[in-house]
Amino acid sequence: MLALHNARITIAGMGLMGGSLALALRGKCAHVTGVDVDAAARSAALAGQVVPAVESDLRAGIVDADVLVLATPVGVILQQLQELKAHTAAPHAALVVLDLGSTKTEIIAAMEALPAACDPVGGHPMCGKEVAGLEHADAALYHGATFVLAPLARTSPAALQLAHAVVAAVGAHALLLDAARHDQLAAATSHVPYLIACALMSAASAAAVDDDALWQLAASGFRDTSRLAATSVKMMLDILRTNRAPVRAALMAQRSQIDRLAGLLEGDEAALAQFLQSVRSERMLRFPPASYP
């Protein structure tokens, strides 16, 4: 069984996630090769010593690889899996294919169709930034993060063990979920929070048309709450497109909570206080701060 320190890893996508992964794996595997279709990204990856070698073509990048990590947007991952599927002459014996996509159902379905010499494992690290690009790569990005692994029925124990080793090497902790459960939970905790931030920003922009002083009052609370609205639209469209039903269900649940709050504002103040205190207590329990006032 191949140990991580002997593995040759290819990372497709020299952006925030792929670049951060390459930095975090430095010295922990035999070799890392980057792949990116963008010439500027390839040059930056080499100039910044993010990877020692980089290719423009996926096929060239996996010639000697033991592990292929797809660190590209969801839509590109699906295209890359299709490309791997087309190469019926196996790209490499026992090539472990791990993706970092933010949705899993469509990706796992595409992985099922990979040739037999590919050994796929679905993945999704629950970390990132609202900014994209290799210039924001950080070796500590994955540290302390939950890293979802979604093995297929065809995933070998060796491939899953190697995926676990990658997760541990970058300082994350693995959580095994099936694709449908992942997509439902990610909709509630990641995808809908982005939409809520967009709605908050849109409502504020509309209100500022009548009174531009609004932006002078928008301090740290507003900035923190609306931060996700700065996320790449192209990336988020891929995510929303491949997770429509769970996102819609989670969005309707949020609307129900907003309606509830509107009703509490019109009713008994004691009931409103009870609701707010309950939510505050849950927040403190789930995400303990250093101190609360």
Question: Across the structure, where does each feature detected by a protein language model lie?
Answer:
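Glycine-rich, N-terminal phosphate-binding loop of Rossmann-like dinucleotide-binding domains
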Residues: 71-73, 101, 151
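Interdomain hinge/lid region at the active-site interface
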Residues: 211-279
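N-terminal Rossmann-like NAD(P) cofactor-binding module of classical short-chain dehydrogenase/reductase
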Residues: 68-69, 98
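Internal alpha-helical scaffold of NAD(P)-dependent oxidoreductase catalytic cores
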Residues: 141-227
